[in-house]
Amino acid sequence: MAVKIKLARFGKIRNPQYRIAVADARNRRDGRAIEVIGRYHPKEEPSVIEIDSERAQYWLGVGAQPTEPVLQLLKITGDWQKFKGLPGAEGTLKVKEPKPSKLDLFNAALAEAEGGPSTEATTPKKKKAPAKKDAPAEAAEAPAEAEAAAESDAPAAE
């Protein structure tokens, strides 16, 4: 059975996305695949190329023939050079820089705005005003405490 490593297209119109598939050479482009070993998204910047290197090496080793576009992708990832024993097995794949997490962005914005994140609410809670009945009782207790303190000082002076 002639086996090819080829691109199986899926995705929207004008936004092609491909699976890198190992399939019988007689099957149609998007037909049944023996195994999917990677993916290729050419419209993203830089293009997303993910190939399972171990499986690609296996299929190349058992005689699967890559199509021309897949051969170029294998050269970019370095799998073709590794298979042939050529120098440059590290490949020339460009990788997108990871995006900072939303939590990191939030903490950076807080640090810039106020000096650091806080665990409290952003607006202070309103304190309840003491009830009017409690206010005179507290006022009455305060002079009583002062009188008691004065009485305790008086016997000590005698």
Curated annotation (Swiss-Prot):
Gene3D superfamilies: 3.30.1320.10. One of its GO terms (molecular function) is structural constituent of ribosome. Residues 137-158 have a biased composition (Low complexity). GO terms for cellular component: cytoplasm; small ribosomal subunit. Keywords: Ribonucleoprotein, Ribosomal protein. InterPro entries: Ribosomal_bS16, Ribosomal_bS16_CS, Ribosomal_bS16_dom_sf. Pfam families: Ribosomal_S16. PANTHER family: 30S RIBOSOMAL PROTEIN S16, SMALL RIBOSOMAL SUBUNIT PROTEIN BS16M. Belongs to the bacterial ribosomal protein bS16 family. This is Small ribosomal subunit protein bS16. It comes from Mycolicibacterium vanbaalenii (strain DSM 7251 / JCM 13017 / BCRC 16820 / KCTC 9966 / NRRL B-24157 / PYR-1) (Mycobacterium vanbaalenii).
